[in-house]
Regions:
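Cytosolic regulatory regions of ion transport systems
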Residues: 1-155
Length: 156
């Protein structure tokens, strides 16, 4: 599959590398040339451009992408502008990181249905793991939830 990751901070960089590692074609985009340079040899392509510039965004192969992932973690305005421009360019499937509940509300209002909330998701998962009393130290590797439930119930 083909992905465009916009915003190459910690989350965007990790997503781009992981998607590439499992066989996907990934193009990364960030305005920061240093971030682009750090990633350019690890993924199919990396481009330095301003994602709030409609003309610049329109130079990207948006229609060829299976999904476009917007991962800005600090700048609410840049995220909203980028998403609005992508929608106006009929960019296709968008997956967007929300940094607050109001950010999530605004992005949903623009028409995005797939939203990433890494801080909230981690908190939920860690709370679940902590409530098991350390029974599973590597909770993120557990995939068989049916047996996890049975084990948890057996120790109650």
């Amino acid at each position: 599959m083909k992905y465009l990751v916009i915003g190459l901070g910690n989350l965007g960089r990790a997503i781009a590398k992981d998607l590439t590692r499992v066989g996907n074609e990934v193009i990364g985009v960030d305005m920061d040339l240093h971030r682009v340079d750090m990633l350019k040899n690890d993924i199919a392509g990396a481009v330095a451009l301003d994602s709030t510039d409609k003309e610049a965004l329109s130079t990207l192969p948006l229609s060829e992408m299976d999904a476009i992932i917007v991962t800005f973690g600090k700048d609410f305005g840049t995220s909203v502008q980028t998403v609005a421009l992508l929608k106006s360019l009929d960019a296709g499937k968008l997956i967007v990181r929300a940094i607050s509940s109001i950010h999530e509300t605004v992005i949903r209002a623009i028409g995005v249905s797939e939203i990433i909330t890494p801080e909230k998701d981690f908190s939920t998962m860690y709370t679940s793991q902590a409530s098991l009393g350390g029974l599973f130290r590597h909770w993120y590797k557990v995939t068989d939830t049916e047996h996890l439930y049975k084990i948890g119930r057996a120790h109650v």
